[in-house]
């Protein structure tokens, strides 16, 4: 006891001493730097303090985006304060520090000699790397008057825009886009990228943004995201501006296979008013050219309820976002205001959107089994999906004082939708050593339904500074609630062929199902930070998270299934009267409502409850001095899981611990290095835990697994940035990797009829490594510049494939899958004699190279890219080839005297190494524009894919299967549009005139083999 008391007293004494030391160093020197000519803040300048009589500085700080720098823990005495930044004359002054000193605003005088020496006439792509920010000067990249932000982003080195509209920067997905630091429509970057005119943008900044709580405490919590922050041109401020576009066109020649008509239309509008204190934007968009200008949250929720078994997903193409023809429309308003003398920052937005998607698909899949036999699947089908949604969002930040503030950000989503999917299928088998196929089965499946959903999520953050600089207390609450209802009909007929016609068996499914899924989660995180002196800080944190997911599904069979007949001419099964129509209305048969004859099917019904409780307690130590900052820490994470499935309970508890380590090192003003490590525990989804077969696709039955355990991820990330501001040379590189303990993988097997089954299980550790580097540089003071992007990745994962000796019927009792028996028989699938463990290793290498010539009238870009991929499988039935996806491209953007403009794009794609040879592809887009009415309007005629060669065939190969999938897609079409610009849109810097939204570069990319990543 005495020893414990002595240790406690010693600890108290040490803490008291550290507080006393910290109290003696509370003086600070504050300064704000501004350009003497423009009054703009001078960011990222070096401010230093040199004690009288000393030769070297004792304190350093960099100014932030607002030009402010604070040097903390300054001892009393006389100092020389200096401010330095390339392009400005050095500032120097003598000061005496007795208490904290505020130097106010210091005007930095531009150094004309340096600026003249560093100037490059229209050269290349000016990029500056500042700590965790990559800044692009938008006016250095040629865009047309009608281009959207998405067109500008495609020109930025290191930034990529996917065919689905997603944006990545240096391999990191962009989670949101802000305007001058203010969120634009919260967490939907597509709304900004597809609807904000490129002409109004001054700067594009790619920022590694920490969580709001980490920004306040200064200690990283691992919740980092990559965002894009836009700066608006000064000419667009303090006035109304906008543009409106309308256009129409036609497929050429007429395309009767897309199922959505041959006429093309597009309409878009953007109205904005921006000041230093407020932002207001109104956006409108509608088209049937696959240019959806928003993230379809309602459609995503509907798809998540249906799981992975529906549709034609086994064909490899599925009903994915890049397939088919999409018609979309939306309208929204976004605003933000600085109120009460900048003490309150208020933002709000509303959006309505709708999507109609039409997909046709034909797929063939060959599966190679371990006994030398193979199965050949053929599918032919279509799907129609409609979704509609409303979104409301708000962001409120209020500063009660310099020490106390709150941040509240709620969001609400309401949506509904409906779907119809139909496909015909056949399965043939080829025995080992044989060449002739034998029919296994044939049939069709038809799925219809509708969905209603809503979500409410957000967070509340309270922040408090406690006297000493660096001593803080913050508390954050996150919440997420959702409700999802799905009402559907599942109808199928599968005829399994026997040795004779008398042995043929028809399996009929005629079901109606009602499914409801509710989820609730609340978490709270308390963080306390304490300065320990000499640049050391301590953080203690505690987080509690509770979540509850409840899913109820009731499935009913029709007691009177009726008779199906086969039409030999159309190769279709039919009934004289269907049980239900596509809208879910009851069909009367012989005067009796089918609904009255329904019988509950317990095998496909379920009642599931999942509850999780996670505690996370951690300690972090941080050291910060001059140009280096380091952080180490650890957390202990006990997790309790409770699952109830159809009255049976499953409980599990696990304790994980997570070390963290981070390093920030600013080598100099132009070069920096970052390194991070984080660990995180995650839970299986409700769908993965649901022990109910999904028979939406009768030949591809997916099962859940109530025995799944949480998995733990380890992640490492490093970054390097270099920028030479005189030569406009920029280099950025990152290396990341990680591994997952007990990852969720899949076990799959086939029965004798060719039906595939899949079951999620916890597998052995998986891992991945990714590397990426980009370089951008001009050629001296010429109009040429070059950019290069190189990336590579490696990953390893495991799956399990059932042997031919595995008897599926052993685990079906009265039609129900026996999870207990399966779990007891196969506690470790890797050691089972009924399953093969397949380890997959995949390696990819991609190189992009682009040469740009640019002057005031024309921009010409020539480039190429090549993606090389190779996979290795431990159970491969044949050697896998090295596949190569290659592209050579050229584009021109030419402003012609007289208000004319010419924009052309040409891509040549060729593919090597695929089992099915792929034809070369030539895609040519062309647009002609004319300025009208004192340059306030632009008339545009554009043609997409003029050679009509866009592919709609995709090919994929894996360890034991080969898949080819055909989908409908947009082909060649022409469209005539008129764009009107008004207000301050004509005050922005003059760019090159040309295309508007929906033209070349906006439509769907080629289907083809897997895209180059």
Feature map (PLM): residue ranges:
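Short, ordered, surface-exposed loop/turn motifs in non-cytosolic proteins
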Residues: 27, 37-53, 127-129
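Membrane-proximal, glycine/serine-rich, low-complexity loop/turn segments characteristic
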Residues: 23-24, 66-68, 89, 112, ...
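Extracellular beta-sheet/turn segments enriched in Thr/Pro/Gly and aliphatic residues
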Residues: 97-122, 228-231
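Extracellular/periplasm-exposed beta-strand and loop segments of Gram-negative cell-envelope proteins
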Residues: 295-297, 315-326, 359-367, 375-389, ...
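A short, solvent-exposed loop/turn motif at the edges and junctions
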Residues: 53-56, 78-94
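Face-selective signature of the C-terminal outer-membrane beta-barrel domain
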Residues: 3, 24, 343, 347-351, ...
């Amino acid at each position: 006891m005495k020893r414990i008391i002595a240790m406690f007293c010693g600890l108290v004494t040490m803490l008291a001493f550290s507080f006393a030391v910290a109290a003696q160093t509370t003086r600070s020197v504050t300064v704000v730097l501004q350009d003497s000519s423009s009054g703009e803040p001078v960011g990222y300048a070096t401010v230093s303090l040199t004690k009288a009589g000393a030769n070297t500085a004792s304190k350093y700080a960099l100014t932030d985006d607002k030009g402010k720098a604070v040097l903390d823990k300054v001892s009393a005495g006389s100092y020389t304060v200096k401010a330095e930044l390339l392009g400005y004359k050095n500032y120097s002054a003598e000061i005496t520090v007795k208490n904290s000193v505020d130097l106010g605003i210091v005007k930095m005088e531009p150094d004309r000699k340096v600026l003249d020496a560093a100037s490059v006439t229209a050269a290349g792509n000016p990029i500056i790397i500042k700590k965790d920010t990559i800044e692009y000067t938008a006016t250095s990249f040629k865009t047309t008057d009608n281009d959207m932000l998405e067109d500008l982003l495609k020109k930025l080195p290191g930034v990529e825009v996917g065919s689905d509209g997603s944006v990545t920067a240096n391999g990191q997905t962009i989670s949101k886009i802000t305007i001058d630091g203010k969120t634009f429509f919260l967490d939907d970057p597509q709304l900004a990228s597809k609807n904000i005119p490129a002409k109004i943008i001054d700067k594009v900044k790619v920022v590694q943004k920490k969580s709001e709580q980490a920004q306040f405490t200064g200690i990283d919590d691992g919740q980092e995201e990559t965002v894009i922050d836009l700066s608006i041109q000064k000419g667009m401020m303090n006035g109304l501006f906008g543009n409106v576009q309308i256009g129409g066109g036609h497929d050429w020649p007429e395309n009767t296979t897309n199922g959505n008509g041959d006429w093309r239309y597009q309409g878009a509008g953007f109205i904005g008013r921006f000041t230093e204190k407020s932002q207001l934007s109104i956006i409108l968009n509608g088209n049937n050219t696959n240019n959806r200008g928003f993230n379809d949250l309602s459609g995503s929720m509907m798809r998540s309820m249906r799981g992975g078994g529906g549709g034609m997903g086994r064909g490899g193409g599925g009903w994915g976002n890049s397939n088919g023809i999409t018609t979309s429309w939306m309208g929204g308003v976004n605003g933000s205001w600085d109120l009460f003398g900048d003490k309150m920052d208020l933002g709000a937005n509303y959006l309505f959107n709708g999507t109609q998607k039409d997909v046709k698909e034909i797929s063939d899949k060959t599966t190679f089994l371990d006994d030398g036999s193979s199965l050949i699947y053929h599918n032919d089908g279509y799907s129609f999906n409609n979704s509609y949604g409303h979104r409301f969002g708000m962001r409120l930040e209020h500063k009660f004082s310099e020490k106390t503030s709150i941040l509240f950000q709620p969001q609400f989503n309401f949506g509904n939708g409906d779907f119809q999917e139909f496909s015909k299928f056949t399965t043939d088998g080829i025995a080992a050593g044989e060449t002739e196929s034998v029919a296994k089965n044939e049939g069709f499946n038809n799925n219809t339904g509708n969905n209603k959903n809503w979500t409410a999520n957000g967070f509340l953050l309270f922040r408090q500074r406690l006297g000493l600089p660096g001593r803080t207390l913050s508390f954050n609450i996150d919440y997420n609630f959702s409700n999802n209802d799905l009402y559907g009909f599942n109808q199928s007929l599968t005829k399994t062929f026997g040795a004779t016609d008398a042995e043929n068996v028809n399996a009929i499914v005629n079901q109606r199902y009602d499914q409801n899924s509710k989820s609730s989660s609340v978490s709270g995180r308390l963080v306390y930070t304490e300065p320990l002196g000499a640049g050391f800080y301590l953080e203690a944190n505690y987080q509690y998270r509770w979540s509850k997911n409840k899913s109820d599904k009731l499935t009913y069979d029709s007691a009177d299934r009726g008779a199906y007949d086969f039409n030999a001419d159309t190769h279709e099964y039919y009934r004289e009267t269907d049980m239900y129509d596509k809208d879910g209305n009851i069909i009367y048969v012989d005067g009796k409502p089918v609904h009255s004859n329904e019988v509950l099917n317990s095998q496909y019904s379920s009642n599931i409850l999942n509850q999780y409780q996670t505690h996370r307690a951690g300690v972090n130590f941080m050291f910060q001095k001059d140009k280096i900052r380091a952080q180490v820490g650890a957390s202990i994470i006990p997790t309790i899981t409770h699952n109830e499935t159809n009255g049976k309970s499953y409980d599990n508890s696990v304790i994980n611990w997570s070390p963290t380590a981070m390093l920030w090192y600013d080598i100099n003003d132009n070069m920096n290095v970052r390194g991070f490590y984080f660990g995180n525990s995650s839970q299986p989804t409700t769908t993965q835990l649901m022990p109910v077969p999904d028979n939406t696709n009768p030949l591809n039955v997916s099962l859940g697994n109530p025995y799944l355990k949480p998995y733990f991820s380890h992640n490492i990330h490093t970054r390097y940035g270099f920028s030479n501001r005189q030569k406009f040379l920029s280099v950025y590189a990152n290396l990341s990797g990680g591994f997952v303990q007990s990852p969720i993988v899949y076990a799959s097997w086939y029965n004798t009829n060719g039906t595939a089954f899949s079951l999620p299980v916890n597998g052995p550790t998986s891992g991945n490594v990714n590397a990426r580097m980009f370089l951008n540089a001009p050629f001296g003071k010429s109009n040429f510049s070059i950019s290069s992007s190189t990336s590579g990745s490696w990953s390893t994962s495991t799956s399990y494939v059932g042997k031919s000796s595995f008897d599926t019927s052993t685990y079906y009792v009265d039609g129900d899958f026996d999870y207990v028996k399966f779990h007891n028989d196969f506690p470790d699938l890797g050691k089972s004699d009924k399953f093969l463990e397949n380890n997959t290793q995949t390696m990819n290498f991609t190189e992009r190279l682009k040469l740009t010539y640019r002057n005031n009238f024309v921009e010409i870009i020539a480039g190429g890219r090549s993606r090389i991929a190779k996979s290795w499988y431990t159970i491969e039935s044949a050697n896998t080839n090295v596949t190569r996806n290659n592209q050579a491209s050229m584009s021109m953007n030419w402003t012609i005297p007289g208000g004319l403009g010419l924009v052309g794009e040409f891509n040549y794609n060729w593919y090597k190494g695929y089992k099915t040879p792929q034809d070369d592809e030539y895609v040519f887009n062309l647009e002609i524009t004319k300025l009208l009415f004192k340059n306030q309007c632009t008339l545009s005629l554009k043609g997409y894919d003029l050679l009509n060669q866009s592919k709609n065939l995709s090919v994929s190969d894996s360890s034991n299967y080969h898949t080819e999938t055909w989908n409908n897609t947009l082909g060649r079409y022409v469209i005539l549009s008129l764009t009107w610009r008004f207000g301050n849109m004509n005050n922005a810097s003059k760019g090159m005139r040309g295309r508007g939204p929906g033209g070349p570069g906006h439509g769907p990319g080629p289907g083809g083999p897997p895209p180059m990543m």
